[in-house]
């Protein structure tokens, strides 16, 4: 039987059995405090997330382009390498207002649209910074196989090295199918947005972030956004964001001012 030799000090025990050694690291005391640089200002370990506080993102994020929305998202933006779901009422298509600024700045690769309900208007998107040559529209046909085809196309797009972001319009989908997309987005570090009808908000989902968005009832120029799921406390009140892009608001304001000045000059010469 091989001899066993044990060497100990205050922090390390080494047990040698023949030519094999097992090194066991342990603390001098079970109540030893963690190093100061691992503690937050409140004395809580940085790896511990408190449910009443908005968590930081586990990875990189892309800013949404709206400071109010960034302040309500873990890490301050859309999570990169994670699934984000956006729910909307029937007939509402507010996804471009929410996603366009991030898509314009996320890189120079392709932005794949799987099953988009309408063909995007390239010049309008280009005016907001998303160049039309980056758009790749995957048309989805109807029928019983449509859902499976959209899922397949979404996963293949996530695996493509030349793709920066994928937007997929999905209807009925199972949690395990969404989890597969989530894993692909994480593996290849892509932005992934799944657009679904609002009735899907009651279904289980592995998404890291779930939002509901629709025009505000009292103002068509205001977009109401609610966080259905995020790593943090529930939102006390929904967000009310400007529905029109900031650049368009400036152009409309300038046009209104110019029109008013022109009318004043016309009246003065009358």
Q: Model-found features: residue ranges?
A:
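Conserved RecA-like P-loop NTPase ATPase core
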Residues: 69, 86, 135, 166, ...
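A short acidic, amphipathic alpha-helical/loop segment
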Residues: 98-102, 124, 153, 177-181, ...
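Long, charge-dense
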Residues: 112-173
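Short, well-ordered secondary-structure micro-motifs
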Residues: 123-125, 155, 178-180, 204-206, ...
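A contiguous pocket-lining binding segment that forms or flanks enzyme active sites
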Residues: 159-203, 214-216
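Phosphate-binding/switch region of NTP-binding enzymes
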Residues: 194-261, 267
């Amino acid at each position: 039987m091989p001899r066993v030799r044990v060497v100990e000090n205050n922090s390390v025990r080494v047990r040698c059995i023949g030519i094999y050694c097992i090194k066991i690291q342990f603390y001098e005391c079970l109540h030893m405090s963690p190093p100061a640089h691992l503690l937050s200002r409140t004395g809580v370990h940085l790896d511990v997330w408190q449910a009443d506080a908005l968590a930081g993102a586990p990875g990189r994020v892309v800013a949404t382009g709206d400071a109010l929305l960034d302040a309500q998202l873990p890490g301050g933006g859309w999570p990169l390498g994670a699934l984000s779901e956006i729910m909307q009422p029937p007939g509402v298509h507010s996804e471009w207002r929410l996603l366009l600024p991030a898509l314009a700045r996320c890189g120079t690769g392709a932005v794949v649209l799987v099953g988009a309900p309408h063909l995007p208007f390239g010049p309008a998107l280009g005016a907001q910074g998303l160049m039309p040559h980056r758009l790749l529209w995957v048309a989805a046909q109807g029928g019983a196989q449509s859902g499976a085809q959209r899922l397949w196309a979404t996963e293949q797009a996530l695996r493509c090295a030349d793709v920066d972001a994928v937007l997929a319009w999905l209807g009925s989908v199972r949690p395990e199918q969404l989890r597969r997309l989530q894993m692909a987005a994480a593996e290849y570090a892509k932005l992934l947005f799944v657009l679904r009808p609002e009735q899907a908000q009651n279904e289980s989902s592995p998404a890291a972030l779930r939002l509901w968005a629709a025009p505000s009832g009292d103002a068509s120029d205001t977009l109401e956004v609610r966080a259905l799921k995020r790593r943090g406390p529930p939102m006390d009140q929904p967000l009310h964001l400007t529905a029109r892009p900031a650049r368009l608001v400036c152009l409309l304001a300038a046009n209104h001012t110019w029109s008013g000045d022109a009318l004043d000059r016309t009246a003065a010469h009358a």
